């Protein structure tokens, strides 16, 4: 992760002057849906550094849209919606192909503070027509995409991105920057935010009211996520080096799932580095299929830690594939065993951790080796899986099947690339 981004999220310092070098990139594992994707890499050059990133959750052509958030030091940040250029008509004779344009901007709005996270509203099927998304920075903000009546129904025409609501805790005078948030998949009226003031706040986004605020950690909270398919349970990580689990039905207590181990003593008997005692944990991700598993990582660490909340205390796996600090982790939305991580070594690594869908599953040493890696042109700071387009988001992890996996990654040089791979997964003899 770029140091100036990490510093802003962690300490609220001013970013460095290297902001104009950041890149944004989109990633996927290659299969051509209905002949749609013709190239290995699709690129979008953002006009500013990018950190916030999320695929649309709606099905159909709208699944090709990305929400993109800038991260610059002035109060002049932007939220942008881009889309793959004319996906239904992308052929060798199209205007976009001849002009070498892969993505087009369809909406943009001002967002004063840097965007620490952006998410589209969870989709539950049906004929819902609202197009909502949310961001964090100074506040939790809800946005709506409004189509121009003259262009209604025309794909990729310019639309309006308007602020629907700004959620503020009226009981708090000081506005502490928000480091992250999550939107509940079962009850889309619920969202939870994390802040550098050590708190997490649960919101009702329909009423705009804070349901509860709690002191979650001893120091800054850097990330928060709902337990998959639960409305009352969420976990957080922070500067105190711990992963904590909370239940909204019993907030008097929390469960510490993991704490940074103390530093190993040197030969002289003293600790080698006392600062390691509270090495911050920066991000976490719940497994979307087998929710007992959490992926997280320490600041300035090359290792991804896998935890099982049924067995707190020690990691069930430690994934070592990066050669520079890890910046992001995200489980596949369609396969319990697939995880992707990105780092300062310019790699987005895909891991196959074996069958985690059954109770008491274990991760063998065999599964702690990378399955494959995408080599980017600069540091990978963020990633997101595409979930809704039928041939894009579905992972068919079965014997000898061609498997398409699609996601997106944010880089350090202002570009967005859609990258594709075609892989085959075989049954292996696992010890």
Regions found by a protein language model. Give the residues of each.
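WD40/WD-repeat beta-propeller blade N-cap
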Residues: 44-50, 108-115, 162-178, 215-221, ...
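Asp-box/WD-like beta-propeller blade repeats and closely related beta-sheet repeat scaffolds
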Residues: 147-185
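Short coil/turn segments within WD40 beta-propeller repeats
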Residues: 73-80, 138-141, 179, 197-201, ...
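Beta-propeller domains
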Residues: 2-8, 12, 20-44, 58-108, ...
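WD40/WD-repeat beta-propeller blade-loop signature
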Residues: 49, 62, 114, 177, ...
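Short loop/turn segments that connect beta-strands within beta-propeller blades
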Residues: 85, 146-148, 205-208, 248-251, ...
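Conserved beta-strand element within WD40/beta-propeller blades
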Residues: 66-72, 132-136, 191-195, 234-238, ...
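Loop/turn segments within WD40 beta-propeller blades
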Residues: 55-63, 119-129, 182-188, 225-232, ...
